[in-house]
């Protein structure tokens, strides 16, 4: 497959390689702009997986679901790929930009509008739940390709 490692300003967590450079791996004569676009979307999911895997490993917990919001969550392909990569349900917020909701909630707490966090959290509703459906073998193959591409970018060729 085609992989985009978007290290345009280096790679942050969990790689911590500020000098890494962006690269596209796996290009052939048969690859076109659709492959590069897909690789760009997939790179978002791979990077989220890298971080979630690190956090769940360190915390000793298992991720069952992830709440998401923001512009990229409109992309159904990306959300399905994210669910598959994390092997977890993706709960897409009905409110596209939850940052604004966060400001409203903080203001509400300051004014004692809500008695508890649970009461304020009820404002955030789920628009869509996306369940993982990719076979484990395919998931491992794709993610292994991503890890190899990242290792090449950061100079770990072994």
Could you say what each language-model-derived stretch is?
Residues 1-158:
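Glycine/Thr-rich phosphate-binding loops that ligate phosphate moieties of nucleotide
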């Amino acid at each position: 497959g085609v992989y985009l490692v978007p290290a345009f300003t280096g790679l942050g967590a969990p790689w911590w390689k500020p000098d890494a450079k962006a690269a596209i791996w796996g290009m052939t004569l048969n690859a076109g702009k659709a492959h590069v676009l897909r690789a760009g979307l997939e790179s978002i999911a791979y990077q989220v997986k890298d971080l979630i895997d690190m956090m769940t490993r360190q915390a000793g917990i298992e991720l069952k679901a992830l709440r998401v919001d923001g512009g990229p969550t409109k992309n159904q392909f990306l959300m399905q790929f994210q669910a598959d990569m994390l092997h977890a349900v993706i709960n897409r917020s009905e409110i596209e930009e939850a940052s604004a909701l966060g400001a409203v909630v903080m203001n509400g707490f300051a004014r004692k509008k809500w008695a508890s966090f649970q009461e304020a959290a009820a404002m955030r509703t789920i628009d869509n739940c996306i369940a993982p459906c990719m076979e484990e073998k395919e998931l491992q193959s794709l993610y292994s390709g991503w890890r190899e591409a990242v290792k090449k970018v950061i100079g770990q060729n072994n």
